[in-house]
Amino acid sequence: MAQKKDYYEILGVPRNATEEEIKRAYRRLAKQYHPDANPGNKEAEEKFKEINEAYEVLSDPEKRKLYDQFGHAAFDPKYGAQGSGGFSGGFGGGFADFDFGSFGDIFEDLFEGFDIFGTSRRRKEAPRKGADIYVDLELTLKESVFGCEKEIPIYRTEKCSVCGGSGVKPGSAPVRCQKCGGTGQIRSRQATFFGEFTTIKTCDACGGTGTIITDPCRECGGTGNVRRQRRVKINIPAGIDDGQVITLRGEGESGIKGGPNGDLHIKIKIAPHPVFKRVGQDLYIEVPITFVNAALGGEIEIPTLDGKTKVRIEPGTQNGDEVRIKGKGVPNLRSRGRGDLVVKFIVEVPKKLTEKQKELLREFERLSSEEGYEKRKHFWDRIREAFS
């Protein structure tokens, strides 16, 4: 007779495995090698039997203790182990005398629809949360910076107000399903290698409810819910950014079997602005100025989201120079502060000049010195150093 395989090795767990680790390994293997998942596969049937034998011992603290001390001999009748907590008859006689007691909860989870213990329990559908609804909401840059209140239409399933969600016409009642006898389940027997199994399926006539609605509610047509449009108000906080999501609890689809409603998730989309660009908490604006403004300096009026304001141009301003106007940017969602407005100057050179303008510029050039052009002076200094 071939030597029995180690029970720990069968389940693929170490000898110091916890009860939860053993149970988890058993669940995985039992599902993999269950006869109903491997019809006609003798090797799978033997493996399934082996897995159950190992779990029967290792899931019981007393039996596991004996096995750790004496090995397979602890449960071999010829060694007299039966009186010490061993199996009554071992496994030689197949599954006729096999104790499935410790497997009930596991099989119930793994093989829903298979009643291997002959029970007739009916599993009730638990209350479930309704589905969430996802929508996009476009805002202007100004709305996102200062916040606002929006009202948007959404379509969602709600409990029928006429029948209260029962689907039955007020004043009438559902009748017992004749096909399943009110159990909500259809049972059939199936012969397998291990004996006769009873398969349980949801009744297709009543959908598992055990009752049939013969006089449905006219408002919902017997479904218990209706599809309606609702307008939902949303408070947009100041400083919200593109891509952020606002969640309104309980504004989603209606709950199932008395469960809570789902949630409404609003994803913010900020439309591009023709003048301003947002980067974090700051706003950026490009302001074109003449080369005369850049050279002489001065003060100009520019737009902000708060209204018009004046900004100073320093004499000698270069193309791309920036100035910051404090507190004219985007509010911080988590504090009271605001970012800045960053003004970038774009020095514009005229493409067309009159003869008089050209003459004046040539005169200006004759009167200019290298000292007035720092970048130009440094450039030629580097050239001279490089080739000297």
UniProtKB/Swiss-Prot annotation:
Recorded hits in PANTHER family, A to Z, give:
DNAJ HOMOLOG 1, MITOCHONDRIAL-RELATED (PTHR43096:SF52)
Q: Does the keyword Metal-binding apply?
A: yes
Listed SUPFAM superfamilies: Chaperone J-domain, DnaJ/Hsp40 cysteine-rich domain, HSP40/DnaJ peptide-binding domain
Where the record annotates domain J, the positions are 6-71
Give binding positions for Zn(2+) 2. 177, 180, 203, 206
| CDD domains according to UniProt | DnaJ, DnaJ_C, DnaJ_zf
* Gene Ontology CC annotation, any one: cytoplasm
Localization, per the record, is:
Cytoplasm
**What organism is this sequence from?**
Caldicellulosiruptor bescii (strain ATCC BAA-1888 / DSM 6725 / KCTC 15123 / Z-1320) (Anaerocellum thermophilum)
Keywords, A to Z, come to: Chaperone, Cytoplasm, DNA replication, Metal-binding, Repeat, Stress response, Zinc, Zinc-finger
Gene3D superfamilies the record matches: DnaJ domain, Heat shock protein DnaJ, cysteine-rich domain, Urease metallochaperone UreE, N-terminal domain
Q: Which GO terms describe its molecular function?
A: ATP binding; heat shock protein binding; unfolded protein binding; zinc ion binding
Pfam families hit by this protein = DnaJ, DnaJ_C, DnaJ_CXXCXGXG
Q: Main localisation, per the record?
A: cytoplasm
Function comment: Participates actively in the response to hyperosmotic and heat shock by preventing the aggregation of stress-denatured proteins and by disaggregating proteins, also in an autonomous, DnaK-independent fashion. Unfolded proteins bind initially to DnaJ; upon interaction with the DnaJ-bound protein, DnaK hydrolyzes its bound ATP, resulting in the formation of a stable complex. GrpE releases ADP from DnaK; ATP binding to DnaK triggers the release of the substrate protein, thus completing the reaction cycle.
Name the chain's protein. Chaperone protein DnaJ
Q: Which GO terms describe its biological process?
A: chaperone cofactor-dependent protein refolding; DNA replication; protein refolding; response to heat
InterPro entries assigned to the protein according to its UniProt record, in alphabetical order: DnaJ (IPR012724), DnaJ_C (IPR002939), DnaJ_domain (IPR001623), DnaJ_domain_CS (IPR018253), HSP40/DnaJ_pept-bd (IPR008971), HSP_DnaJ_Cys-rich_dom (IPR001305), HSP_DnaJ_Cys-rich_dom_sf (IPR036410), J_dom_sf (IPR036869)
Q: How does it assemble?
A: Homodimer.
